[in-house]
Amino acid sequence: MAREREGGGRGRREDREERDSEFVDKLVHINRVAKVVKGGRRFGFAALVVVGDQKGRVGFGHGKAREVPEAIRKATEAAKRGLIRVSLREGRTLHHDVNGRHGAGKVILRAAPQGTGIIAGGPMRAVFETLGMQDVVAKSLGSSNPYNLVRATFEALKNEDSPRSVAARRGIKVSTLQSRRRDADPADQSEAAVA
């Protein structure tokens, strides 16, 4: 027996809308560009969009078109094609501090205690909000170009490792790794007190 759907068809549009509804998108930057032609200037728009599911997946895209909505649509589609998965500690922050760099844009991302919130500027804030991160401290150095900052933030997020992946790479158990970390912490604190 064939399943009946309201509206007929095979339901591809409905499936696509359900898949799209799980993503949150944020417009980071829109830029008006001009091409000089024989008859004058021809204007176009470039859009930078960040898309995420607020559960650890995020992507960014760049789109160009003659009209703003079309540029945003293209950027959103590109962002959905380039999603990356980021492991979050307790579903709210990073496992460890990471640095990222793209061009002259540099970012430092630090794990933060619960209740800190997102302490980040401009383009980085959009990435963290769509990622679903709740507590993070971020600092951007060098270039303030939104394209470079978003790319540098993604480079930093790609460098982040969960304890599970580190333990698998070293061939040890996660509990062993975490016990070593707890054993090392008091020594670091006593050395800091002496200095």
UniProtKB/Swiss-Prot annotation:
The keyword RNA-binding applies. GO terms for cellular component: small ribosomal subunit. It comes from the Bacteria. GO terms for molecular function: rRNA binding; structural constituent of ribosome. Residues 23-86 form the S5 DRBM domain. Keywords: Ribonucleoprotein, Ribosomal protein, RNA-binding, rRNA-binding. Residues 1-20, 161-195 are annotated as: Disordered. SUPFAM superfamilies: dsRNA-binding domain-like, Ribosomal protein S5 domain 2-like. Belongs to the universal ribosomal protein uS5 family. The N-terminal domain interacts with the head of the 30S subunit; the C-terminal domain interacts with the body and contacts protein S4. The interaction surface between S4 and S5 is involved in control of translational fidelity. This is Small ribosomal subunit protein uS5. The gene is rpsE.
